[in-house]
Structures are given as structure tokens and as C-alpha cells.
Amino acid sequence: MVAEVQKQAPPFKKTAVVDGIFEEISLEKYKGKYVVLAFVPLAFSFVCPTEIVAFSDAAKKFEDQGAQVLFASTDSEYSLLAWTNLPRKDGGLGPVKVPLLADKNHSLSRDYGVLIEKEGIALRGLFIIDPKGIIRHITINDLSVGRNVNEALRLVEGFQWTDKNGTVLPCNWTPGAATIKPDVKDSKEYFKNANN
């Protein structure tokens, strides 16, 4: 099974570092919630801690939207635990509020299409999975550029809005902004107001 937008997310069960201990984490555990699954290439590297720390610091915002952030790496759970024990000022993570999944056999990275086989590391994939287990969004960055927490949160809020209200969202939409009724006639209301 390969991850695709509008398809069921590949299931997984992995050992994770959660609040300083090891815990088995599965996608099934979060059924009924949105899941933001993000992959990082390597523990103790450079861009990765900035991403995990930023998403961890924003964990409450995602929780308030009924979403759980998960990070996955091809490192072992022991490496990930050691990384959380290293202070942030030294390039570590310190305590984090998001589970860190150990994908040491690379099955998760492979199933989600982010594994660089030759190097045994993952590209910076970000997947938004809805409460029914359907993938709604995929982005995959090269190794050198980190992701944007606010954009990930905006996408979760956007998918939730469209699911609830049946409207579609224009470019650069933010919560509270105008939406579009997906109908040839009714959509004209949006375009009339947007182009005055």
C-alpha cells in the first residue's frame, strides 16, 4: 500500500517516545481525530530539531482542533529518547509534547513513499489524515528545507471547515475568511466580492 491523497492511510504500529517512555503507537489509536504525520531524516541533525520543537510548541493548537501531531524517523527509539534528553540549546529536543515514532525497519517511511532507500532515511514528508483514516494532504520536502507549522494547522482547519460546511476554500484562506460555494451560480457571490 502506498500513501495517496483521497485513499486510506497505510496502517502502522511503531514504538514511540512519549513523555520520556516507550509506548506502542498505531494509527488506529487516533481514529476519529485528525492526524498530522511528519517524517524527519535523522536525529541529532540540523533542521529536524527546529521542526519537532516548533510542532511540539504548537501541540495545544492542534489538540484544540482535534488533531494529533506525530513525528517519525528511521532512528531507533533509543536514539530518539537520547535526543529528547539533550537540551534544546545544545541541538537536542528537550521534553516534547508530540510522540516520536521509531521506524527502524523503514516500513512506515516506505509505505508513505518518503524513504530514500540508499541512505535509509526519510524525506521531510507531511501527511494530514482525517478522522476516517483518509489522507487529505501530502507534501514532501527535500532534506534542506523545514516545514511551516502555521500552514499545517491552517490545512487541518481548512479540511475541517469544508467537511462541516460543504464550501471550498480559496487560495490563502484563513479561518473566518470568505469561502466559495461549489456551484457555478452560487460561486459568483464570492468572486464578485473578492474582485471589487
UniProtKB/Swiss-Prot annotation:
GO molecular function list: peroxiredoxin activity; thioredoxin peroxidase activity
Record family assignment: Belongs to the peroxiredoxin family. AhpC/Prx1 subfamily.
Additional comment: The active site is a conserved redox-active cysteine residue, the peroxidatic cysteine (C(P)), which makes the nucleophilic attack on the peroxide substrate. The peroxide oxidizes the C(P)-SH to cysteine sulfenic acid (C(P)-SOH), which then reacts with another cysteine residue, the resolving cysteine (C(R)), to form a disulfide bridge. The disulfide is subsequently reduced by an appropriate electron donor to complete the catalytic cycle. In this typical 2-Cys peroxiredoxin, C(R) is provided by the other dimeric subunit to form an intersubunit disulfide. Present with 4820 molecules/cell in log phase SD medium.
Gene3D superfamilies, sorted: Glutaredoxin (3.40.30.10)
Source organism of this protein record: Saccharomyces cerevisiae (strain ATCC 204508 / S288c)
Active-site residues (renumbered): 48
InterPro entries on file: AhpC/TSA, Peroxiredoxin, Peroxiredoxin_AhpC-typ, Peroxiredoxin_C, Thioredoxin-like_sf, Thioredoxin_domain
Phylogenetic classification of the source organism: Eukaryota, Fungi, Dikarya, Ascomycota, Saccharomycotina
Key words of the record: Antioxidant, Cytoplasm, Disulfide bond, Isopeptide bond, Oxidoreductase, Peroxidase, Phosphoprotein, Redox-active center, Ubl conjugation
Record field: catalytic activity: a hydroperoxide + [thioredoxin]-dithiol = an alcohol + [thioredoxin]-disulfide + H2O
Chain ranges of the Thioredoxin domain: 3-161
Predominant cellular place of this UniProt entry's protein: cytoplasm
Gene: TSA2
GO CC annotations, alphabetized: cytoplasm; cytosol
Chain positions found as Phosphothreonine: 174
Subcellular location: Cytoplasm
Protein name: Peroxiredoxin TSA2
Subunit structure: Homodimer; disulfide-linked, upon oxidation.
Described function: Thiol-specific peroxidase that catalyzes the reduction of hydrogen peroxide and organic hydroperoxides to water and alcohols, respectively. Plays a role in cell protection against oxidative stress by detoxifying peroxides and as sensor of hydrogen peroxide-mediated signaling events. Can act alternatively as peroxidase and molecular chaperone. Oxidative stress and heat shock exposure cause a reversible shift of the protein structure from low MW species to high MW complexes, triggering a peroxidase-to-chaperone functional switch.
Cross-link (Glycyl lysine isopeptide (Lys-Gly) (interchain with G-Cter in ubiquitin)): 14, 89, 132
Induction profile: By peroxides.
GO annotation, biological process: cell redox homeostasis; cellular response to heat; cellular response to oxidative stress; hydrogen peroxide catabolic process; protein folding; protein stabilization; response to oxidative stress
